[in-house]
Amino acid sequence: MKHWRLVSYDIREPKRLRRVAKIMEGFGERIQYSVFRIYSTDKELEKLRWKLAKVTEEEDNIFYLTLCTKCASGAHTQEKKSAWPEAPKTLKIL
């Protein structure tokens, strides 16, 4: 099941910062300079964490927050383009 997730980071070295930003751009949408929102499964999140662990150091900090549907619908920004869309409808195969 997919969930909205908020990922923010504080990377101490510019080269690593660029690498982390490039990886994050492949997984989600930038909301602020070092804050991204992604819509992913738990497995996709683990893949992201694994990729980021390969390029970061112990001094770097990455924060992951999984949002429930109600919390995600209550998240707002000043820019209309950054409004959190509703989760796409999922199909159940019976």
UniProtKB/Swiss-Prot annotation:
Q: Which UniProt keywords apply?
A: Antiviral defense, Endonuclease, Hydrolase, Magnesium, Metal-binding, Nuclease
Give any single GO term for biological process: defense response to virus
Q: Where is the signal peptide?
A: none
Q: Which SUPFAM superfamilies match?
A: TTP0101/SSO1404-like (SSF143430)
A Pfam family hit: CRISPR_Cas2
Q: Does the keyword Metal-binding apply?
A: yes
**Where on this chain does Mg(2+) bind?**
10
Q: What cofactor(s) does the depicted protein rely on?
A: Mg(2+)
Q: Where are the transmembrane segments?
A: none
Q: What is its EC number?
A: 3.1.-.-
Domain of life, source organism: Bacteria
Q: Per UniProt, what is one GO molecular function of this protein?
A: metal ion binding
InterPro entries xrefs: CRISPR_associated_Cas2 (IPR021127), Virulence_VapD/CRISPR_Cas2 (IPR019199)
The answer to keyword Nuclease applying to this record is yes
Please give the PANTHER family that the UniProt record associates with this protein: CRISPR-ASSOCIATED ENDORIBONUCLEASE CAS2, CRISPR-ASSOCIATED ENDORIBONUCLEASE CAS2 3
Q: How does it assemble?
A: Homodimer, forms a heterotetramer with a Cas1 homodimer.
Which family does the entry's similarity section mention?
A: Belongs to the CRISPR-associated endoribonuclease Cas2 protein family.
Instruction: Give a short account of what the protein does.
Output: CRISPR (clustered regularly interspaced short palindromic repeat), is an adaptive immune system that provides protection against mobile genetic elements (viruses, transposable elements and conjugative plasmids). CRISPR clusters contain sequences complementary to antecedent mobile elements and target invading nucleic acids. CRISPR clusters are transcribed and processed into CRISPR RNA (crRNA). Functions as a ssRNA-specific endoribonuclease. Involved in the integration of spacer DNA into the CRISPR cassette.
What is the official name of this protein in its record? CRISPR-associated endoribonuclease Cas2
Which source organism does the UniProt entry give?
Answer: Leptospira interrogans serogroup Icterohaemorrhagiae serovar Lai (strain 56601)
